[in-house]
Structure formats: C-alpha cells, structure tokens
C-alpha cells in the first residue's frame, strides 16, 4: 500500500493525502482487542514504530514484534500507565535508566497535546521568573537562584531580581523530593522564602515574595539587544533565550539595528537557551554569517524507513536569504563570540555547530548540554500518520489526548560533524558566579566582560575568579512543556511515498 502526503512538522502541520487507503504500513499492523483499555498505548506504539529515530534499535518496536493481535494486546495491557509505557519503548530512556547510562535523554510525552502544541509557540502558564536550582552542600535541601525575569510578567512587578536566592515555598524548605510539586505543581500562586549568601553559606532571610502564574503568557526570547562601543569597535550583544518562530521578524529587526549601528562583532548570549525551532536556528545563523543559499547549514538523518524516502536535497538545509516575510539582515561576520553553558541545548548548539565550518566560533562559558537530535509532535490521528495538524484537531481520537514529542532524527553540519552528545566544550572556560551574577548586558557582567576582553585584546582589568560556581541540577525552563526540545518545522516534500 502506498501513501503520498504533504505535511509540516512542528507547531503548524498541514497534511494532504492523495489516496483513499487506510494509512502507512511498514509490516504487519497489529490491532488491540477493541474491549481493551489501551488506546493511548496503541497510539504510542504505532507512532513510535513509524517515526522514532532509534526504532530499529528497540526490539519492542520491531515491525515483526507481534505475531497475533492477542499478543499485541497483552503487551499493551502489561503497562497500564501511558507515560511509563512510552518511556519503556524508548531507547534506554533517562527516565528509566538514569542520566549516566541513558541513550534517549530528551523524548517526552504530555497527556494534553494542546498544552504541548501551545508551548511550541512559547505560550505557557508562567509568573515570569526564570531560575536555576542547586543543592545545599551534601544535603537533599535545594536552593533557587534567579537568572532573569520576563518583562511585563507578574515577577517583573514584584520585589525580586536576578542574583537573588530562595530556599522555601509557602514556608516549606525545598528538597529534591518536593521541589517539583512546590514550584511546578498545580498551585498558580506561591510565596518564595528568600535567602542570602555569604562566605559560601546560604542563610534564610525574612523577605518573602508572592508570585502568580498567568495563563497564556508568551516570552519574547530577545531579552537584550544592544550595540556596545568597545574601544572604538561596535559590538552587537544579543541575549537570546529560546528559538521561537513567532519572533523571527523581531530577531531580524534586531539585526537590522545592529547593522545600522555599524556593528562588526557579535556576542551571542545563549547561556540559558534550551532550544526550539530548527528553522529559526537557520535564520539566526544566516543573520550572523550570510545569505548564500548554496551554503549547507545542516543535514538531517532519520530512521532507515523514513530516510530512504527523502532526497538529498530535502535532507539538506541551506543558509537563508529571507525569513519568509522579509529579506534577512546579515552581519556577514567571520567570527562570533558565543556565551553558552550547561543550560544551552539543542537549537543553541545547532547554531554553533552549523556555523563552525564557515566562521570562527569562540565559545565562552561551560560545556553545553549535548542534544543533537530533533523531534516532531505526534497525536492520535492515525489517518494523518499521527502527525499533528491544527486543521485536523477534530480528527484526533477524542478518547486519547496524549501528545508525543519523540526524537525522530539528528542534525550534522556541512562537514558531517554531529557527535556532541557530551556537549560542546568552550574555548574559554568560565562559569557564572553566584556571588557576582551581574546585570545581563552590562559590560561588567563577567561572561560578557570576558568576551569583550577577547575582542579588544586589552589586558585583564576584571578579576574573573569564580568564588561560588552556579551549579544547578535543573532549571525552571526544563519544567515547561517545551523543555529543551528542538523541533523540526519545515515541510516534507509533496511526493513523499512510504510503503
């Protein structure tokens, strides 16, 4: 059976079939007993069997795994929790195997696909406070430190700022066992118990700050965009916190301003950027390097059954000369200074790796997270091959609202390099200092100051000694539906044919 279709992956998906048969088949297609309560598990298995990057490496996802429908039904019923079932059919997922031995660290599921889809546009319930969480000494107690605050958010109206600390929520000490429920639970309002740091010791203070999460909040990922004069050199500085396609024009406008200011150097600050849109990463790279549409930005690799259907041309993404709405404003740089840390992942790393064959990428900060795979959004719409399409929400199984964001491929640069699962290492190593986080965009903020020192060639005037490294085990951004996802948002070819 053959299926010809056109679709968009990522947030907005358009699907058009040119045949009347009942879906792609890649081998025997098992069906569960209709009386079994396994709709979610059935959807998950079939979607992952088709699209999952490591499908061939997971025995339970093999096309010939089940010889009878009864065997398939029993397999699905064996795990009644859909989320646990999903992670069990991933390739050694971190949720089961832990960080040290996991292969798949990033695929995830959401029991409400509408929440997942909204997050891809940067829409979420938020109070606007972004923070890291660390451990207090050798205990299970947790402290938080404020990294930045969204403009025009609830937090922006409260007495709290970057560099402050907290240890309690609603009077309860944060621990590794309760922080998720206290900070990221269903409570829309909570009160932070603040703390101070002196001599590497965190002490509770009497200060309290109450914050309220607001529905449908949208973070503008461009936190700071300014041009600095460094000993006569015009240096553009961009603090960019997530790759969101809905802000592509704002990003292009920022580069237009950099050009108008005469910027000849760029410091791209992605220290807190967990990723996002692959296409937006391509546009940003073009704004930095150039708009030659014959230069390869990245190449994709899917699982074997999908890869075989794509042409080399489709699998290759080139630098762009347009955002789709306007001509790209490019600085045409021969080098770039990137501030990146362990909080920098996926599309952030993609920009660095994609630019590396063409210009000198000077990485200042820490080793990045190490995420080189991309994902797509899957829902229980079997007639659309499980791809989410905003125009087909009425066709999604009303009894199953689960949405999946599995890893379905990886990216490599023009030189073929892709192996950075351990992260990208900095040329200039420097951690944030909890005792001196500084003001983002200020020339004295330590990481920016180090980049400017490299640009100017001036001898050190700032002491870069780190007294208390900002070591976190998680951050607020990793507890949003989008997490550190890198999603593909490009159309597949109209002549795609799967057997």
Language model regions located:
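C-terminal motif of bacterial Sec signal peptides marking the signal peptidase cleavage site
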Residues: 14-17
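Positively charged n-region of N-terminal signal peptides that target proteins for export
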Residues: 1-4
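C-terminal "post-core" interaction segments
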Residues: 246-253, 258-265, 274-499
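Active-site-proximal loop/turn and secondary-structure-junction residues that shape catalytic pockets
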Residues: 215, 272-274
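Flexible, low-complexity junctional segments that flank or bridge functional domains
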Residues: 19-265, 280, 290, 470-499
């Amino acid at each position: 059976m053959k299926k010809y279709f056109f679709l968009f992956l990522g947030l907005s998906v358009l699907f058009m079939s040119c045949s009347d048969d009942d879906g792609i088949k890649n081998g025997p297609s098992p069906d569960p007993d209709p009386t079994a309560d396994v709709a979610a598990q059935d959807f998950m298995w079939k979607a992952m069997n088709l699209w999952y990057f490591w499908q061939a490496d997971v025995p339970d996802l093999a096309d010939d795994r089940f010889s009878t429908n009864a065997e398939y039904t029993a397999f699905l019923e064996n795990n009644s929790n859909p989320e646990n079932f999903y992670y069990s059919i991933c390739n050694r997922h971190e949720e089961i195997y832990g960080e040290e031995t996991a292969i798949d660290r990033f695929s995830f599921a959401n029991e409400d696909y509408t929440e997942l889809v909204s997050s891809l546009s940067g829409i979420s319930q938020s109070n606007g406070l972004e923070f890291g969480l660390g451990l207090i000494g050798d205990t299970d107690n947790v402290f938080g430190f404020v990294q930045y605050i969204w403009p025009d958010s609830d937090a922006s109206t409260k007495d709290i700022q970057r560099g402050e600390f907290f240890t309690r929520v609603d009077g309860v000490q944060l621990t590794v066992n309760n922080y998720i429920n206290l900070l990221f639970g269903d409570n829309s309002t909570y009160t932070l118990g603040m703390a101070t740091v002196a001599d590497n010791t965190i002490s509770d203070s009497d200060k309290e700050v109450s914050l309220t999460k607001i529905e449908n909040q949208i973070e503008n990922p461009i936190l700071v965009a300014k041009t600095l004069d460094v000993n006569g050199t015009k240096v553009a500085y961009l603090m960019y916190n997530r790759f969101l396609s809905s802000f592509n024009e704002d990003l292009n406008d920022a580069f237009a301003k950099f050009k108008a200011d005469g910027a000849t150097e760029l410091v791209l600050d992605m220290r807190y950027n967990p990723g996002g849109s692959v296409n937006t990463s391509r546009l940003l790279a073009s704004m930095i390097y150039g708009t030659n549409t014959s230069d390869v930005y990245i190449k994709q690799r899917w699982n074997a059954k999908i890869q075989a259907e794509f042409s080399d041309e489709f699998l290759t993404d080139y630098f762009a000369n347009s955002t789709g709405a306007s001509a790209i404003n490019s600085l045409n740089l021969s080098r770039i200074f990137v501030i990146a840390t362990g909080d920098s992942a996926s599309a952030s790393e993609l920009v660095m790796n994609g630019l590396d064959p063409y210009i000198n990428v000077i990485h200042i900060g820490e080793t990045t997270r190490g995420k080189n795979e991309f994902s797509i959004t899957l829902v229980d719409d079997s007639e659309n091959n499980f791809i989410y399409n905003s125009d087909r929400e009425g066709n999604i199984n009303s009894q199953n609202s689960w949405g999946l964001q599995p890893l379905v491929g990886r990216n490599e640069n023009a030189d073929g390099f892709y192996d950075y699962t351990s992260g990208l290492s900095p040329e200039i190593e420097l951690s944030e200092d909890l005792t001196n986080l500084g003001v983002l965009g200020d020339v004295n903020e330590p990481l920016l100051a180090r980049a400017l020192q490299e640009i100017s060639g001036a001898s050190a005037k700032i002491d870069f000694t780190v007294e208390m490294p900002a070591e976190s085990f998680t951050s607020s951004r990793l507890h949003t539906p989008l997490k550190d996802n890198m999603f593909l948002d490009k159309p597949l070819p109209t002549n795609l044919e799967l057997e």
